[in-house]
């Protein structure tokens, strides 16, 4: 019997990527994975439905993949946040889709595909769940030397602009022993860098242990053989404790890199956003981090054009960015998401004002990064090799998240392996990237 060929298109965030990797692990037991949609008997589109742009990208991708039903494709499957949020509506709007699964129903994937192939049945499963997740096996879609490691699912923060709690459910931590087991599995399969993710990593453990236990988890991850770098994302400022900051200073495997989603700094805007912190708390946390760990690279994300954001609020945000000079910064225009409290707030900001404010902040950030990178010339960093483009090796130091932040380009006389770590001396700077050379000097 000819094996079914599956094609998978994964959109959206790193949590979605993990979902795709779990699905691929399941379907490869029954068939073959192909990267060419023209060859696929079954195409799965794992969607993002977080903001308007991501919804549009998801719909466009579904329609693009539906064209292959004129050729070899027999079943088109849509999974992920968009189907969880709009399942029934999408099923009516997109008759080309055979199977629609939400984020809690991936265990029904194989049966739904089988019913579609054998009986022509359409399936819709978009159930809401607060069960604790267990990743099981995964097929990595990243380079083999790094992987994302999810420690919790869902969110209890209920920011007024965000639909994630409605899509992903309440916050559910995984047991420490399950996380450590997965980290060991990843290490045994060649992973050297694990990137810790959740909607909010700093809340980890509160729901199952009665206290926030992220520092304890990081200590245990440090003991996993083969893991050289641990990178931590999505740390909410109000939950960054002295204990966590101390762990950054102590833990030799924990990269001096942290992602802290701040979103804004004006107290009036933060209050309307439903954020738990305020300007005083945020600035104190950032200063405490830099005081205890001076080499810490802090990434953050900001939202401009939130309802009621006045010019003085935006000026306060610009002053904040100028003062703290983040190594990595993402700036997003507020997206009016239906079903969220912010969508019906008064004083919605015009789209052109949002765009102007975003461009202004990004111009500031380009100048800031230019200055930061200039100070790196002649310094030596440990760099992991991510790729080779035929002329240069492409790598990252501890300050760089793969595929998101900048990169370091360098040449080497000998052949290097992907995932190998080398010492690189920085020679030149580009806008966000660096150019260097392999050197014999020590690095860490």
UniProtKB/Swiss-Prot annotation:
Similarity annotation: Belongs to the methylthiotransferase family. RimO subfamily.
Name of the gene: rimO
NCBIfam families to which the protein is assigned, alphabetical: 30S ribosomal protein S12 methylthiotransferase RimO, MiaB/RimO family radical SAM methylthiotransferase
InterPro entries linked: Elp3/MiaA/NifB-like_rSAM (IPR006638), Methylthiotransferase (IPR005839), Methylthiotransferase_CS (IPR020612), Methylthiotransferase_N (IPR013848), Methylthiotransferase_N_sf (IPR038135), NA-bd_OB-fold (IPR012340), Ribosomal_uS12_MeSTrfase_RimO (IPR005840), rSAM (IPR007197)
Stretches assigned to the TRAM domain: 374-440
Cofactor mode of binding and number, as noted: Binds 2 [4Fe-4S] clusters. One cluster is coordinated with 3 cysteines and an exchangeable S-adenosyl-L-methionine.
Gene Ontology BP terms: tRNA modification
Residues binding [4Fe-4S] cluster 2: 155, 159, 162
EC number: 2.8.4.4
Positions annotated to bind [4Fe-4S] cluster 1: 13, 48, 81
Location of the protein in the cell: Cytoplasm
GO CC term (a single one): cytosol
Residues of the Radical SAM core domain: 141-373
Name the record gives this protein: Ribosomal protein uS12 methylthiotransferase RimO
Organism: Clostridium tetani (strain Massachusetts / E88)
Span of domain MTTase N-terminal: 4-118
Required cofactor(s): [4Fe-4S] cluster
UniProt KW Ribonucleoprotein keyword: no
Gene3D superfamilies: Methylthiotransferase, N-terminal domain (3.40.50.12160), Nucleic acid-binding proteins (2.40.50.140), tm_1862 like domain (3.80.30.20)
Task of the protein: Catalyzes the methylthiolation of an aspartic acid residue of ribosomal protein uS12.
Keywords recorded for this protein, A-Z: 4Fe-4S, Cytoplasm, Iron, Iron-sulfur, Metal-binding, S-adenosyl-L-methionine, Transferase
PROSITE patterns: MTTASE_N, MTTASE_RADICAL, RADICAL_SAM
UniProt KW Cytoplasm keyword: yes
Catalytic activity of the protein: L-aspartate(89)-[ribosomal protein uS12]-hydrogen + (sulfur carrier)-SH + AH2 + 2 S-adenosyl-L-methionine = 3-methylsulfanyl-L-aspartate(89)-[ribosomal protein uS12]-hydrogen + (sulfur carrier)-H + 5'-deoxyadenosine + L-methionine + A + S-adenosyl-L-homocysteine + 2 H(+)
GO molecular function: 4 iron, 4 sulfur cluster binding; aspartic acid methylthiotransferase activity; metal ion binding; protein methylthiotransferase activity
């Amino acid at each position: 019997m000819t094996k079914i060929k599956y094609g998978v298109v994964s959109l959206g965030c790193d949590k979605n990527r993990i979902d795709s990797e779990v699905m691929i692990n399941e379907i490869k037991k029954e068939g073959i994975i192909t990267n060419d949609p023209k060859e696929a008997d079954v195409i799965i589109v794992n969607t993002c439905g977080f903001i308007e742009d991501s919804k549009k990208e998801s719909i466009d991708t579904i329609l693009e993949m539906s064209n292959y039903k004129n050729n070899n494709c027999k079943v088109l499957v849509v999974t992920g946040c968009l189907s969880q949020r709009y399942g029934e509506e999408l099923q009516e709007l997109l008759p080309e889709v055979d199977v629609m699964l939400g984020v809690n129903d991936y265990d029904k994937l194989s049966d739904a595909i089988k019913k579609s192939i054998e009986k022509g049945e359409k399936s819709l499963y978009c159930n809401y769940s607060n069960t604790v997740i267990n990743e099981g096996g995964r097929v990595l879609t990243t380079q083999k030397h790094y992987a994302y490691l999810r420690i919790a699912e869902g969110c209890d923060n209920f920011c007024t602009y965000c639909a994630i709690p409605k899509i992903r459910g309440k916050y559910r931590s995984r047991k420490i022993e399950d996380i450590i087991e997965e980290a060991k599995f990843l290490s045994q399969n060649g992973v050297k860098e694990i990137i810790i993710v959740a909607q909010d990593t700093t809340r980890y453990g509160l729901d199952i242990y009665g206290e926030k236990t992220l520092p304890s988890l990081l200590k245990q991850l440090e003991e996993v053989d083969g893991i050289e770098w641990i990178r931590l994302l999505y740390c909410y400022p109000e939950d960054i404790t002295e204990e966590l900051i101390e762990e950054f200073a102590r833990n030799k495997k924990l990269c001096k890199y942290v992602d802290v989603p701040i979103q804004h700094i004006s107290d009036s805007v933060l209050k309307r956003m439903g954020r738990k912190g305020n300007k005083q708390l945020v600035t104190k946390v950032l200063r405490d981090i830099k005081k205890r760990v001076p080499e810490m690279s802090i990434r953050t994300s900001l939202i401009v054009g939130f309802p009621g954001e006045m010019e003085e609020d935006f000026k306060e945000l610009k002053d904040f960015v100028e003062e703290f000079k983040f190594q990595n910064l993402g700036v997003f225009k507020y997206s009016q998401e239906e079903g969220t409290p912010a969508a019906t707030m008064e004083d919605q900001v015009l789209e052109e004002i949002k765009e102007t404010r975003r461009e202004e902040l990004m111009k500031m950030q380009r100048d800031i990064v230019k200055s930061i990178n200039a100070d790196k010339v002649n310094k030596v960093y440990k760099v992991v090799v991510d790729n080779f483009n035929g002329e240069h090796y492409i790598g990252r130091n501890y300050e760089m998240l793969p595929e998101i932040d900048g990169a370091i380009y360098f040449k080497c006389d000998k052949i290097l392996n992907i995932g190998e770590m080398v010492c690189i001396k920085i020679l030149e700077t580009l806008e966000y990237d660096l150019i260097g050379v392999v050197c014999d000097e020590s690095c860490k």
